[in-house]
A protein has these predicted regions:
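C-terminal structured domains
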Residues: 117-178
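Conserved mixed alpha/beta catalytic, RNA-binding, or beta-rich assembly cores of soluble enzyme
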Residues: 1-139
């Protein structure tokens, strides 16, 4: 149950939080990479905080967890959203630079493969779940990949848009094989 609550709060709700608290923008690959970087930023700290909050409560009321037991985490999200708000209207390069910086602070360590549209963490020897967070498949792919702290991304037997390939190159080193 804890893993499910973690996914709901730290992926879906955190994504929704940033989408609701950034100035209006058109979703593009660069802004998606920024949002995904923000969502995965501080994931370890937030997951530990959430586990402690769950252990101390008798029920799994998500609103109660967020509004009372996770106030410190939610305040951090607000501060990050405020800082990121200035980037939404920045250039594509600035957006990618900040997204790359945020991602790199979590420590790039994994080799990732995209093969036939599926994502694999080669370092950990497992398939990565691609959650349906956004309406567009490539944006969900960005979310899945950024969450793996990639140092290298191998793309095989998968046709991705030029924008997606450009985004991946800003996230980590890319090897393209067909």
């Amino acid at each position: 149950m804890t893993a499910l609550v973690e996914v709901v709060i730290l992926t879906y709700m955190k994504t929704r939080f940033f989408l609701d608290n950034l100035p209006p923008f058109i979703m593009t690959h660069p802004t998606c990479s920024l949002i995904c970087s923000l969502v995965h930023f501080d994931r370890g700290y937030e997951a530990n905080h959430l586990r402690r909050a769950i252990a101390e409560t008798a029920d799994f009321n998500v609103d109660g967890l967020c509004n009372f037991r996770l106030q410190e985490v939610m305040q951090n999200w607000s501060e990050v959203a405020e800082l990121a708000s200035r980037l939404v209207s920045s250039t594509e390069r600035d957006t990618y630079d900040v997204a790359s910086f945020i991602t790199s602070t979590e420590g790039a360590k994994n080799r990732i493969a995209i093969d036939h549209g599926r994502v694999f963490n080669l370092t950990e020897g497992r398939e990565v779940q691609i959650l349906p967070v956004f309406e567009e498949y490539e944006y969900n792919l960005i979310m899945a990949i950024v969450g793996q702290n990639p140092k290298e991304i191998i793309v095989e037997h998968t046709n991705l848009s030029n924008e997606m390939m450009s985004t991946l190159k800003h996230v980590a080193g890319v090897v393209y094989r067909n």
